[in-house]
């Protein structure tokens, strides 16, 4: 019976690119021809059972073996033809590919608390008893999956009042606020490095698999130095979140104590690798001065080759401070997989609750009542959890990873950076880049955000400050961006249709409204994107019962603002545009740096006539 493993290896060998396309028999044939032409007087018998045949077999086997290893080494240089796990993992590391571990799922968790009403205004809660639920609060599900709160849930503002109730002649408000949670478990590990440790760039492999995030790394020094994760050890700055007066700012700070992560996709483990400087903090942020390595030339006008220790070039504070002789404590989150994609309303209770009352000096009995009234749930199912990628899946991802760059070269690079900015520093909803008509050296970056009701709002000064600092680390020298608020133009849709006598008018009108709202997908419009009026007309004409459209196409989309608002329960901004001047051949173009918004579905008006 054939060995399946050997057969598979042979199949891979013969199917791959081969530098020397010869097997044993071909080597033997050439050797036989060479022996007969050069050693015919010494050996004349080269049959299988003869001494000459044995020598030919030996030489052919050696030739085939050498060919195999040459082909193997050549093929291992290419990620597409590499067959060994070690070689493929090396290509994955060179490509700086990340994300091959099991990923956690994410879900929006709703927090509900019961707070006593304010004594002066019964419609508002007593602000002294509005808590902050801090990030890293633990939650667990009915199915046994743990979740961790990723951001602070601050009830001081932007809460939602669900209902009011009265108990024992005291008025209470039921408040709701949401926060993002990700699946996983928080673990701690401590390890020490000896003072006489001679290894360069000390490292330690963490015990748990599928580590998704390192929360904190610090040592036992008297100053308790915190180590920061960087992409490579020569990167000496990191982003730091600074909270000032309830605004979050994004600063860039030096990181003399830093580390990189090395991921082993074969066993799912993560290794932390530190710098190699001798516990010295780099003051100027420069690499080792080459002048320190220069050798003086005395009493002669020539020099010979002199051996230098390469460590002198890398033993620099610019590559990070070494933790030699210290104890390191690591706090991290691990875990993930498809089974972490829990169903709706599966999150049941807290596993650990971290909270504070910023308006109270001491937590009293009433504050404890507020905490005890707290409940949590997830209205939607969790998404994003995936199992670890196989080596073949990682191989296919190498080309994309190799094309990634750390610089903003074109508009697509800038938009990708903006949308991937850490959520701790704010989220933008839409962004667009346009040339500045006044100068060729600057671009206008238009941004817009959303509030809790999914309405467009201008970005805060803190968010603009964060964006400026964030893109400054990636932009090419000479590139200038003006961060500008995108103008929001509230619109309404007006259609006058003629309906067939065989159909109910109210039903057809409702169908037209619903189809326009569903198929046009106004909420997906980008900054500067136009509206296809012809598409709206086609949607209406395709609705059963509609005979003709009698509206002027230039007036199908109209400005909706505070001056022409006749409904007291709707609010609009003051921006306006000319639907006639911006209309051309069935397309309504947005003003420069503007975005259209259909704020209410009721703003789709369809009449008959």
What are these regions (language model features)?
Residues 1-609:
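Signature of Asx- and small-polar-rich beta-strand/turn repeats characteristic
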């Amino acid at each position: 019976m054939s060995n399946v493993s050997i057969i598979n290896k042979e199949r891979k060998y013969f199917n791959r690119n081969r530098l020397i396309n010869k097997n044993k028999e071909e080597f033997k044939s050439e050797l036989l021809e060479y022996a007969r032409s050069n050693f015919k007087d010494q050996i004349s018998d080269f049959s299988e059972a003869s001494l000459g045949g044995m020598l030919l077999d030996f030489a052919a086997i050696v030739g085939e073996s050498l060919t195999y290893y040459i082909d193997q080494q050549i093929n291992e240089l290419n990620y597409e033809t590499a067959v060994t796990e070690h070689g493929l993992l090396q290509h994955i590391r060179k490509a700086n590919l990340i994300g091959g571990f099991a990923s956690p799922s994410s879900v929006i968790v709703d927090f509900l608390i019961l707070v006593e009403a304010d004594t002066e205004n019964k419609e508002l809660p007593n602000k002294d008893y509005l808590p902050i639920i801090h990030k890293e609060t633990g939650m667990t599900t009915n199915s046994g999956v743990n979740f961790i709160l990723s951001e602070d849930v601050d009830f001081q503002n932007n809460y939602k009042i669900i209902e009011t109730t009265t108990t024992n002649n005291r008025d209470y408000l039921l408040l709701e606020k949401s926060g993002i949670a990700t699946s996983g478990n928080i673990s701690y590990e401590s390890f020490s490095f000896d003072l006489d440790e001679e290894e360069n760039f000390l490292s330690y492999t963490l015990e748990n698999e599928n580590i998704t995030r390192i929360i904190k790394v610090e040592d036992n020094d008297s100053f308790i130095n915190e180590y920061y994760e960087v992409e490579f050890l020569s990167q000496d700055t990191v982003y730091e979140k600074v909270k000032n007066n309830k605004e979050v700012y994004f600063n860039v700070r030096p990181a003399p104590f830093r580390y990189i992560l090395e991921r082993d996709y074969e066993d799912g483990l993560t290794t932390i690798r530190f710098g190699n400087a001798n516990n010295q903090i780099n003051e100027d942020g420069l690499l080792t001065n080459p002048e320190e390595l220069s050798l003086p030339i005395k009493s002669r006008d020539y020099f010979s080759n002199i051996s230098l220790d390469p460590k002198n070039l890398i033993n620099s504070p610019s590559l990070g401070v070494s933790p030699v002789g210290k104890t390191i404590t690591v706090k991290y989150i691990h875990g993930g997989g498809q089974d972490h994609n829990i169903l709706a309303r599966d999150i049941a209770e807290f596993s650990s609750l971290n909270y504070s009352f910023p308006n109270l000096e001491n937590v009293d009995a009433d504050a404890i009542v507020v905490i005890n009234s707290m409940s949590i749930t997830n209205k939607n199912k969790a998404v994003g959890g995936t199992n670890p990628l196989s080596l073949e899946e990682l191989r296919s991802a190498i080309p994309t990873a190799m094309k990634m760059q750390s610089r903003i070269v074109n508009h697509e690079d800038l938009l990708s950076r903006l949308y991937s900015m850490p959520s701790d520093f704010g989220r933008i909803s839409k962004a667009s880049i346009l040339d500045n008509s006044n100068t060729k050296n600057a671009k206008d970056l238009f941004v817009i955000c959303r509030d809790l009701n999914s309405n467009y709002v201008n970005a805060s000064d803190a968010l603009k400050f964060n964006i400026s600092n964030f893109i400054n680390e990636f932009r090419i020298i000479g590139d200038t961006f003006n961060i500008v608020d995108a103008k929001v133009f509230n619109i309404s849709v007006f259609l006058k249709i003629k309906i067939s006598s065989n159909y109910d008018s109210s039903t057809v009108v409702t169908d037209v409204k619903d189809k326009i709202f569903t198929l046009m997908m106004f909420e997906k419009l980008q900054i500067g994107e136009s509206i296809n009026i012809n598409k709206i007309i086609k949607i209406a004409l395709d609705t059963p019962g509609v005979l003709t459209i009698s509206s002027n196409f230039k007036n199908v989309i109209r400005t909706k603002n505070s001056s022409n608002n006749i409904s007291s329960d709707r609010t609009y901004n003051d921006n306006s545009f000319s639907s006639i001047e911006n209309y051309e051949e069935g397309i309504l173009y947005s003003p420069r740096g503007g975005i259209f918004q259909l704020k209410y579905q009721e703003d789709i008006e369809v009449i008959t006539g």
